[in-house]
Amino acid sequence: MKNTKLIVNTKSKAYPIYFGNNILNKTGILIKKNLPNVKKICIIGDNNLPSSIFKKLIKSLKKYDLIIYKFSANEKTKSLRVASIIIEKLLNNNFNRSDCVIALGGGVLGDLSAFVSNLTKRGIKFINIPT
């Protein structure tokens, strides 16, 4: 499958969706192209994913300062307690509105990551990588 870019237009903005083979290996390049001011990235991932998935993503993001959290993808994780722990870590690591949160996994972690990114500094960048 060829890599494909789809543009989603909303009332307030447009954003790209990328999909295709080996797209995880190109994440760093795509971030640099679309979000050139990002310096720090927090990956919030499913601890049940194979380590090879994390390794591919981390290798692609080697030029960025990374914080990595792995959680169980269950409803207990989608809580204010967990969100506040992540937000505190982001603030302690001086994340700002030009930095980024990446969700790596399913819906629970995507919801949690989107929530965290929207609350931190009135909204930092968010990327969802569903598995």
Q: Model-flagged regions — what are they?
A:
Residues 1-100:
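ATP/NTP phosphate-donor binding region
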Residues 78-131:
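Glycine/threonine-rich beta-strand-loop-alpha-helix active-site module
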